[in-house]
Amino acid sequence: GGPKRGGCAVLRVRIAALFLRCAMSVLRHLALAGLVAYILLCLMMFVLQRRLQYFPDPSPMDPAAVGLPQARSETLTTPDGERLVIWWVPPRDASRPVYLYLHGNGANLQARAERFARIVADGAGLYALSWRGYGGSTSTPSEAGLMIDARTAYGELVRRVAADRVLLYGESLGSTVAVMLAAEVPVRAL
């Protein structure tokens, strides 16, 4: 009876060792697969970061079609050659402020038409910028590009009205740019 027990014990040890080697091999392969998946995910996020960060609606826009007939759609060219769409509603008189409107992510100026109608209802002016890549404007959005767009729009607006009449209105994505712009240029309010 003794030799059989020793043989069974050796067999059990060998089976356990084989199982352990197989388990370790599977774990190594899983770890390697996980590492490869993580690296691919990081690479994908790097390559697609603009698409994950910005959600532009590039559709062309007509202010009259969305209930803002007093707005003129204009085009402004940035120093880096991009064309931006601007909706311009002059103020009722020289005493009224003008809102430089920097919109948020995920839509275009058409989606804000009701808000614009409320802004201009009391005679204030509106200079609403459509970021690069949004609503008829060229290129694709980027942090540096948004700042170029805002500086360009501000520069054109202060050729039309005094800086002390400009109110910066930033919505969501545009609020960050508005704060950064207000740190650089004179405005009536933010």
Model-derived features with residue positions:
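Membrane-embedded segments
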Residues: P79, R83-E156
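N-terminal Sec-pathway targeting helices
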Residues: I15-A37
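Alpha/beta-hydrolase fold nucleophile elbow
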Residues: V161-S172
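A conserved short beta-strand
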Residues: P186-L190
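Glycine-rich nucleophile elbow surrounding the catalytic serine of serine-hydrolase chemistry
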Residues: G170-M180
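An N-terminal hydrophobic leader/cap segment in hydrolases
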Residues: L30-T77
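Conserved dinucleotide-binding and phosphotransfer motif residues
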Residues: D122, R160, E184
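Extreme N-terminal basic, low-complexity initiation segments
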Residues: G2-L11
